[in-house]
Amino acid sequence: MEVLGSAVQQDGPSASLTAPNGSSQRRLIESVSRIISDNIGNSSLEAHGTGTALGDPIEAGALNAIFLAQRSATDPLLLSSLKANSGHKEPGAGLAGALKLVMELRDTTMSPNAQLRALNQHVGSSLHKSVACVLPVQPGLLQMTEPTATGGVSSFGFAGTIAHLVTQCATSEASARAGSSYKLHSHARHSFPWVSQTASSSDGLWA
């Protein structure tokens, strides 16, 4: 896995302390795109997507504005959010989303928004203005160029800190052809002793 670019900033003035600023979100993501060059396209994007009535439409509008000119009905940007399936992980939400994205890129399979029953009408109206972004409710294969897949992840803090990261990952198929594996080096298997307590054994944790 390689981090191609990232940015963190404060979103500036908004309606209230917790209200997001869509223009700032858009500028943040566009700044990362400029860092990594415009010819690298995301296969998918892990949105912040908290399920709030105010925040989700603002984020959806910003994403649609960014990717409207870049995507089409045959190559839409696939959007998902871990929170739709597991709830909000608070301080760990950004890391959890990044891990989910890396696994999706590695396996070239998009995780569905399994608990999605109905879109916030304001999110729907934003995304339905174009076919640039879609919200899959079934697992699906990512559109990508072998041997790597690229994706982005957004994470927004309670008080206005916003972050976006773009990463590129070798697919499982490409790694198999290269004879590599995703198992850690033996010395790294005991680097996280506090995590091992959640598995019945160390081997089970890394399986």
Language-model regions, residue ranges each:
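Condensing-enzyme catalytic core of the thiolase-fold
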Residues: 1-205
